[in-house]
Amino acid sequence: MTQLTNFSESFSNQNSNLHQPYNFNSHQPPEENHYYVREPNGKRPFPVEFELDMEYVPRTKRRFDKISACLENFSISNDKPSPINICRESSSDEEMDEVYDDSNFDQCTESTSIPLVVEPDDEPAVAKKIRLDESIQRYFEKCRQGPIDFLPKPEKLKGNEMVIWQPRILVSPKNDFNMAGRIQEIDDEEEDRVNEEIKTRIIENEGMIDEDTRNETTGIVELGTGSDHSDIGSSWSSPMASPTGSSQIVELDPDSPNSLTNGSVTDEEMMEFE
């Protein structure tokens, strides 16, 4: 172990001799058997006056305290600032336990508050009035002297009036507790009629009733047939041939031997039709 330690010490000394600073701005090439290392530039040094107080404080905490100190006397309201925002300590990690009395509050507000500056108006108060045209001024003066003719006036009925104007009384629904005219009672017959209308509308909206097929018709549903022609008068005609295995609805004449009304259809065919 002793020899290994001595060997390592001699090796480190040898490297220290080879390691020399080199001016990278010079145009002279480096000498042989020497290597040069550029020392990295460190971060910007922290201000010395804050090193003692903020040595063990995280960066986020320091940033928070710095911004809080800048916004200590800042207020966006015109109200009197509270003593918590003005006379609080600069460090935010200590909680304020004592309550300031009125004397300390007045001293803080007098020293830190900024007086409000009231700027005078550039124009006199007369300029803020509305300036009217001469014709409008004459019209207003005429209306002051005599009553306006086109406005309705309370008079007795003469009997030859065409339309009697009655002012409408505006009543707020919030102040009107009388529900007359808003709620209408119905009897049992009216309730049944309304329920039937509601059921009909629901069925029509769901597509269970078609307006074109309200008339009762007789027909046979042929399942699994691939024929392109029908017996008599198909209710659905298309220039394209129906594909194999599709269903087809065919209307039949009542005199046809396969009609549903003449009794020639068996029970099995009726079950297939259903």
Swiss-Prot record:
Comp. bias intervals (Low complexity): 1-17
Polar residues compositional bias, start-end: 18-28, 239-249, 256-265
Protein name, UniProt field: Uncharacterized protein R107.5
Signal sequence bounds: none
Region (Disordered): 1-38, 222-274
Basic and acidic residues bias locations: 29-38
Record organism: Caenorhabditis elegans
